[in-house]
Amino acid sequence: MKKKVAVIHPEAGFSSSGGSQLSAYEMAEHLATFFDVKLLSSSKCSEHSVVIPCVPRGKVKKAQRNKTIDWLLTRFVSNPSLLIESLTSFLTYTPYLMFKRCDVTYPNNDYGGLAVAAVIRKLFKTPILYTERAGMVSNGKVLRRNLKFKPDCLVVFNQETKEYVHSIAPEQRVEIIPNGVNLAKFSPQGEKYEHGLQGKVLLTVGALNRQNHKRIHLVIEAVSQLNDVSLLICGDGPDVQYFNDLCTQKLGAQRFKIVKVDFADIPNVYRSVDAFTLPSEDEPFGRVYREAMASGLPVVATDDSMRRTLIGKAGVVCNVENIEEYAAAIATTLSTEWANTPIEQAADFSWESVAERYADVIKSL
């Protein structure tokens, strides 16, 4: 009889723009080869979905576009969307799992899902598997908080994070398993997005918010140092107009475009450009880098241990805060013949191979 695994993410199905909900969906799909899997979500997104009502973070973020609502919510908490999702899902997901027992819980939505899983473990001794996607962001602040739930197995993305975990929780079981990429969806073959830009085209993907860690302004500054290079920005957020004005000022109206597309069309966007970059301050998840490489694109990224491991020989890492160095790295990347190196690098992160490693962990719990 197959083990029953409950994968938890309320936002899955409601939004496809975030890395954690996409991973929850992909993990549910691929773990179903080995186990009886249920994906607990607020909206139907796969044949494995069990729809349980709550207020997912995406719905709160939409409400926050109203300045009055945003002001009211952020007066009391820095991340109201995650808090509201966590509270409302705790009230509905916990009773469900009390009556629909599983053998392993696998929360994917930060402390909200961990709280649900902790109650179920307390009642029924059900082990918890958790993937720490924040890594060393904010000097490990999120990681330290989530360690208080003491998951039966914690999955991290690199050796540095594993060593940090053991420095503060020596008894914690930790496994290193990379995040996956859908190689069937992201590949060089297929339709291309018609962006109409001239010359070599550099792509960046991310939320357009001056307050986040993506640092899109650094890309704009770097491209402004180069001739015959255009910038395609794929994303949405509260500061679209700000970045549009900055691009117009730095690049001119003919050398950039800001577009918003459905997730299903993202592969077409990757195929339409010559290289990819994201100069984020920290990027423990790394989904967009993997998608870009799987699409055949070389990558320019921030120089840190995670991205050196992730990108390998499929691109260039540099000090992106040094605009001259960043611009030179982009120029080198666009003038280099990369052949199949990016695709070969991405092949190590197929969801099939990642799911097999997770399956081995689940069988051991």
Question: How would you label these PLM feature ranges?
Answer:
Residues 298-301:
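Short hydrophobic beta-strand element within catalytic cores of glycosyltransferases
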Residues 8, 196-214, 220-224, 232:
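Conserved donor-binding/catalytic core segment of Leloir-type glycosyltransferases
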Residues 261, 268-273, 358:
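Short alpha-helical donor nucleotide-sugar binding micro-motif in glycosyltransferases
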Residues 244-261:
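Nucleotide-activated donor-binding/catalytic signature segment of Leloir-type glycosyltransferases, i.e.
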Residues 85-86, 107-113:
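Short His-centered aromatic/hydrophobic patch
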Residues 160, 180:
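Carbohydrate-associated surface elements
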Residues 281:
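Aromatic "clamp/platform" in nucleotide-sugar-dependent glycosyltransferases that forms part
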Residues 313-323, 331-336:
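Conserved acidic donor-binding segment of nucleotide-sugar-dependent glycosyltransferases
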